[in-house]
């Protein structure tokens, strides 16, 4: 298959850096020069250079160009779709906002104690951002926490208006939710989530028991399966929640990657029983521990009371910087960049899977490929092969069924050809 201009530029610059043709701190050829050299558009060059900054080969100087970053042995990996490294464009933009935040506001930010719910201005910024995404709420129903883990911890500990005690979780699910339930010895039940959703009849039986306080769900780009509920499925789940007085905790951690703008549970909710959670660390950078919760009115006081015990408020400097980052359009710019990269990755992965003899066993997700394991000759041999596969052990609160494994997007081209010997020959194409 012919290598794209984008990849040719990346390969050329990587090789030149690794062989010492470009030394640490040296400016590389300009965008215009590279575009001429490779007979491509400036946009293609910019995307390639951006990718190399994510991989820590280059760094950018505003109004100057790109320079070679100091190299460390065995440090580089191909970039996964999830842009969670600190040296990326989102980080550079956010650092600009932090610097702007500190100008003339030192006394305010270092000596002020804000509302326990978070700075009003950042909650108003988030309110506007959510409105753009079809999620409508007044700013006084938004509460900021120091990450999703803190939000889930608070919700698991407080009493809900329905006076129930059990938490329902999907299996598999976010590993930190499993850890929270296990470490706090909280009462819980589970329901199986697969590549098509959940069994609604089973869900009704569980709700009907009368003990479910809330149902924690990841409706869009489920972790780790990548599945998203259809609008019809969401409406059915909400109807059951209304009927049996169950709250829904909607973790929309990758909602920004949904180019279809499918309605959220919160949008569809008519009975004020959805708690909507949006994290800002997943799509910006992992050190940004700010998560927003949209709460029903009945939960505002108990959440804020319990939050006071844990901490008074989240980092004010980071809150103010996030407000600026949203208000000046950088957040939406980063979102567009993520969607563009996701589209590119999906096209690349689709080509890889359609050309693979393993095609019947493969399912594309937003960040990689799922591998169905029922036809593997020896699961033990595959597990000990050294191949970079995620078998989802931590995503199950009890024993892992080993039904699926994930190949990360960045590993797909290398790993797929090495998997064929592990499968029954008659199941290949």
Language-model segment annotations:
Residues 276-355:
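PLP-dependent aminotransferase class I/II
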Residues 63, 138-139, 362-369:
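Short Gly/Ser/Thr- and Asp/Glu-enriched loop/turn motifs at secondary-structure junctions
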Residues 262-281, 301-302, 403-406:
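Conserved active-site segment immediately N-terminal to the catalytic lysine
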Residues 166, 213, 245-247, 273-275, ...:
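Proline-centered loop/turn at the N-terminus of a beta-strand
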């Amino acid at each position: 298959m012919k290598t794209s201009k984008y990849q040719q530029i990346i390969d050329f610059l990587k090789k030149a850096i690794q062989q010492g043709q470009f030394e640490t701190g040296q400016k590389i050829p300009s965008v215009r020069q590279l575009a001429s050299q490779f007979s491509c558009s400036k946009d293609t060059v910019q995307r390639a250079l951006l990718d190399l900054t994510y991989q820590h080969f280059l760094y950018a100087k505003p109004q100057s160009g790109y320079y070679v970053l100091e190299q460390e042995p065995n440090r580089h990996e191909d970039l996964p779709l999830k842009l969670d490294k600190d040296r990326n464009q989102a980080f550079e933009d956010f650092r600009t906002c932090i610097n702007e935040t500190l100008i003339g506001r030192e006394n305010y930010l270092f000596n002020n104690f804000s509302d326990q719910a978070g700075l009003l201005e950042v909650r108003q910024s988030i309110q506007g951002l959510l409105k753009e995404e079809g999620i409508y709420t007044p700013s006084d129903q938004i509460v900021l926490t120091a990450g999703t883990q803190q939000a889930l911890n608070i919700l698991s500990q407080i009493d809900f208006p329905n006076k129930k005690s059990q938490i329902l979780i999907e299996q598999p699910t976010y590993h930190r939710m499993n850890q929270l339930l296990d470490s706090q010895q909280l009462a819980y039940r589970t329901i199986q989530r697969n590549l098509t959703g959940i069994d609604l009849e089973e869900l009704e039986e569980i709700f009907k028991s009368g003990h479910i306080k809330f149902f924690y769900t990841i409706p869009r780009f489920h972790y780790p399966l990548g599945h998203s509920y259809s609008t019809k499925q969401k409406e059915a789940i909400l109807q059951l929640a209304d009927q049996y007085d169950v709250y829904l905790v909607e973790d929309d951690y990758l909602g920004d990657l949904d180019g279809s703008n499918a309605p959220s549970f919160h949008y569809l909710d008519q009975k004020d029983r959805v708690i909507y959670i949006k994290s800002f660390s997943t799509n910006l950078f992992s050190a940004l521990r700010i998560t927003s919760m949209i709460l029903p009115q009945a939960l505002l006081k108990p959440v804020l009371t319990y939050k006071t015990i844990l901490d008074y408020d989240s980092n004010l400097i980071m809150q103010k910087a996030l407000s600026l980052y949203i208000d000046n359009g950088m957040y939406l710019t980063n979102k567009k960049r993520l969607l563009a990269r996701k589209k590119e990755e999906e096209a690349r992965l689709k080509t890889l899977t359609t050309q693979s003899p393993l095609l019947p066993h493969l399912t594309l997700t937003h960040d990689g490929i799922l591998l169905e394991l029922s036809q593997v000759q020896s699961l033990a041999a595959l597990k000990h092969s050294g191949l970079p596969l995620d078998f989802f052990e931590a995503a199950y609160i009890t024993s892992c069924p080993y039904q699926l494994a994930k190949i990360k997007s960045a590993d797909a081209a290398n790993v797929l050809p090495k998997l064929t010997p592990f499968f029954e020959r008659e199941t290949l194409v």
